[in-house]
Amino acid sequence: MTDRLIIQGGKKLSGTLQVDGAKNSAVALIPAAILAESEVVLEGLPDISDVYTLYDILEELGGSVRYDNKTAIIDPTDMLSMPLPSGNVKKLRASYYLMGAMLGRFKKAVIGLPGGCYLGPRPIDQHIKGFEALGAKVTNEQGAIYLRADELKGARIYLDVVSVGATINIMLAAVRAKGKTVIENAAKEPEIIDVATLLTNMGAIIKGAGTDTIRITGVDHLHGCHHTIIPDRIEAGTFMVLAAASGKGIRIENVIPTHLEGIIAKLTEMGVPMDIEEDSIFIGEVENIKKVDIKTYAYPGFPTDLQQPLTALLTRAEGSSVITDTIYPSRFKHIAELERMGGKFKLEGRSAVISGPAKLQGSKVTATDLRAGAALVIAGLLAEGRTEIHGVEHIERGYSKIIEKLSAIGADITRSSTAETNI
C-alpha cells in the first residue's frame, strides 16, 4: 500500500497555525536523556515518526519511556549499552546522536550506519574525529560503527566543517569526560543552545553554546530534570512561506522571531506584509511577489531547509529569482516535480533559476525528501486543480498533523491509501 496526499488547490486560506517543538532539537534531546541517572521529562515534543522511533530505541536499550500528548518521561536508570545494528536505527539519520550519548555514559556503543533523507554526501567524519580526540577507538565493522574507550578525556577539537550534528554529538560525549573540552568552529544553531540547556539542567557545565567556541567541563554524574523544547523554526518558516503563497491572513503561533531572521528578511524583500509579535507572526495577503536571490548558509544565514519550500512560492514572483544552496548543492530534486506542475526552472550547478510568474496546474508528483515534500504541498495549494503527492512518509517525518493543521485554515487536503502503482 502507498499513501498519497490529495490537494484541491487554488483556495485562499486563513486562520491560525500552531508550531510544534523543534524536530532537530527533539532528535538530540531524547538520546541526551541516556546520560542522566534519573528521570528526564521532556515537554513540547513534536508528534512525528522520528520521535517514536527514538522511544523504541531507548526501550531496546532497557530504558523506560512513558509519553502522553507532547510530553515524554524517560527513565534511563536500567539502560545497558546494547548493540543497535540496524532496524530502527536505519529509519532516521539523527540516530547518530545515540553514539555520543552512549559513549558518554557507557564508554562504548555499536550502531548501524544511520538512515533518514538522502541528501548526497553527508558523512560523519567530523563526529568520529571528535570522539577519537576524546579518547575513543572508532572502527567500521560490517556496516556498523564500533566505539570503545577506556576513559574519555577532555580535548580541544576543531571542526573542519561547521556541523550541527558533530557539535551536538561531541557535546553529548564530552559532558561526562574527565577534564575540559573545547569545540572550535562549532555550529551556532538554536537547537544546540536547546540541547546545552537540557544538559546544563542535568548538571553539565557548558559555556558558549550558540557561539563558535563551546567550553565543557566534564562532571561524573548527571541527574534527571524537566525541559521544554524550543519551537521548530523550520516548521514556522514553512508556514510563513505557505501563508505568503496561499493565505489571506494567517497567524503563526508558538514562534521565536529571532530564530527566523533569515526568512523574515527575505519575505519582507518579496513584499510580504508581516506583523511580528513576541511569540507569533501574522502574514497578510500578498498580491504581487517580488523576485529575490537567496543563498543558503549555516545559521544565522538563510536555512537550507527552507530553500525548497521557498522555490514553490517563487513560481509566483515576477521575473527571475536565483536560489543557491551552499550547504547541500544537490538539494534540487523537487525541481523536476515542480516542472510537472508548470514551474519554469533552470539548474546551473548549485543554483536554481526560477522564472515567474508561472501558473501551476495540479499534477501527480513525488516527495523525494522531507523539505521537497513541504515544497510540493505549498505548490499543490497554489495550483489550479488536483495535486496528488506520493512519498507522504517523508513529509510526516518532519511535520506533525499536517493534514489537520492545513484543513483547519481552509485547505482541501486529504490522505488516500491505494495499492502500489508506478507513476
Swiss-Prot record:
Tree of life domain: Bacteria
Keyword terms, alphabetized: Cell cycle, Cell division, Cell shape, Cell wall biogenesis/degradation, Cytoplasm, Peptidoglycan synthesis, Pyruvate, Transferase
GO cellular component: cytoplasm
Protein name (Swiss-Prot/TrEMBL): UDP-N-acetylglucosamine 1-carboxyvinyltransferase 2
MF-aspect GO terms: UDP-N-acetylglucosamine 1-carboxyvinyltransferase activity
Active-site residues, Swiss-Prot/TrEMBL: 117
Residue list for modification 2-(S-cysteinyl)pyruvic acid O-phosphothioketal: 117
Gene symbol of the encoding locus: murA2
Positions with a binding annotation for UDP-N-acetyl-alpha-D-glucosamine: 93, 122-126, 305, 327
Protein family per UniProt: Belongs to the EPSP synthase family. MurA subfamily.
Natural source organism: Listeria monocytogenes serovar 1/2a (strain ATCC BAA-679 / EGD-e)
InterPro entries named among the record's database cross-references: Enolpyruvate_Tfrase_dom, Enolpyruvate_Tfrase_sf, MurA_subfamily, RNA3'P_cycl/enolpyr_Trfase_a/b, UDP_GlcNAc_COvinyl_MurA
A Pfam family that the UniProt record links to this protein: EPSP_synthase
Cellular compartment(s): Cytoplasm
Gene Ontology biological process: cell division; cell wall organization; peptidoglycan biosynthetic process; regulation of cell shape; UDP-N-acetylgalactosamine biosynthetic process
Reaction catalysed by this enzyme: phosphoenolpyruvate + UDP-N-acetyl-alpha-D-glucosamine = UDP-N-acetyl-3-O-(1-carboxyvinyl)-alpha-D-glucosamine + phosphate
EC number annotated for this UniProt entry: 2.5.1.7
Function: Cell wall formation. Adds enolpyruvyl to UDP-N-acetylglucosamine.
Pathway annotation: Cell wall biogenesis; peptidoglycan biosynthesis
Keyword match 4Fe-4S: no
